[in-house]
Amino acid sequence: MGAKITTKQDGSFMSLETDMVVVSASISEDNPDLKTARKLGIKVVKYSQILGSLMKEKRGIAISGTHGKTTTSAMISTILKTAGLDPTFVIGGEVPDIGGNAHLGKGNLFVAEACEYDRSFLNLTPQVGVITNIEEDHLDYYENIEKIINAFGDFASSISKDGLLVVNNHDDNVAVAVQRAYCKVETYSLDNSSDWYGEVLPVGSGIKRFRVFKKDKFFDEFILKIPGTHNVLNALAAIAVCTFIGVDKDSIKTALASFLGANRRFQIVGVRSGITVIDDYAHNPVKCAAAIASCQPLASKVVAWFQPHGYGPTRFLRAD
C-alpha cells in the first residue's frame, strides 16, 4: 500500500504534507510526534474516533468488558466469516482462523473490540453490543469502580434502540450498567436464570462440549477446542449475537468447533519432554486465575510466570 513505517518518535516524521494524525488512547500530550503535529496545525484524531466513523457506514457490533473482549470478538468474526457474510473486523489480537486482527469486508457488518480505556468505546455507534463483565481495571484513568460502571452505562445507552445488548447475567456491576440501555437486552450464564445458558458436558483433554438453551428451550449442542469454562461464556455471547444477526445454527456450530482462539489467549506455544508451554495475555487477578484454572485439567503440575502489564496497572492491583 506504500505506507512508510518508522519506529522513531522524535517529531521528524511529521510534515505539512500530513493530512491527519491518528493517535491511540495511550499516547500522552508530551509525545514528540503529537506535539509536532499540533505545532504544524495538522488535524489530530483518536483511533477510536476513526473506528467510530468507519462503523457508521455499516451495521456495528461492539464487544466490551474487562476481559473476554478479544476472544468473543474473534468468535463472532469467525462465525460471520464461516456464514459467508464477509464482515469487516478490528480485533485486539491476531486470530489465525480469519487471517489476522483486521479485515475490510464487503459485507455490511462491522465487528469491533470496544476498549473502555479513556472511554474510547463511546466513540462507536453499534447496533449490537456485548458486555462480558465489569471489574476494576485502568484505574490510572478511572480511579474507582463506580466511574468504570458509569462508563459502561454510557456504552449500554449508546446501543441503537432497535438493536440488542448481550450481557453476562452473573456480574453485579453489569447489572447496574445495563439499567441504562434503551434497546432489547439478552443475558447469558451457565445456569437457567438467563435468556441464554450453557450446560457443560464432561469430555476431558481441554475440549469443551456444551448444550445451549434459549429461554429454557434446547437450542443446540456445541464443541469448543479451546479450554476454559470462561470460553464457554464467551461462546454463549457470540451465539446470542450471531443468532440475532440471523446466522444459521450450522454455521455457528462449524465455526466454534474449528475455532483455535486468538494469539496470546491461552495459546499453546509448544510441547517438549512432556512440558506444554502456554502463552496467555492475562494481566489482572481475575484473568490470571482463569488462565491457571484452564491449565489445571491439562496437567498435574502448573508453573506460572507473570510479566507485569505496565507499571501503573500493576501498582493499582498490587494488593490483589
Which ranges hold each PLM region?
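Beta-strand->loop->alpha-helix junctions that form or flank phosphate-binding loops
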Residues: 6-9, 45-52, 90-93, 182-204, ...
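Glycine-rich, highly charged phosphate/nucleotide-binding loops
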Residues: 2-15
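Nucleotide phosphate-binding/pyrophosphate-handling subdomain across enzymes
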Residues: 204-206, 210, 214-320
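Well-ordered beta-strand positions
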Residues: 103-104, 123, 202, 267-270
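Conserved catalytic and cofactor-binding micro-motifs
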Residues: 1-2, 212
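Phosphate-binding loop of NTP-binding sites
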Residues: 12-18, 25-169, 173-182, 236, ...
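Short beta-strand/turn micro-motifs at beta-sheet edges
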Residues: 117-120, 199, 264-265
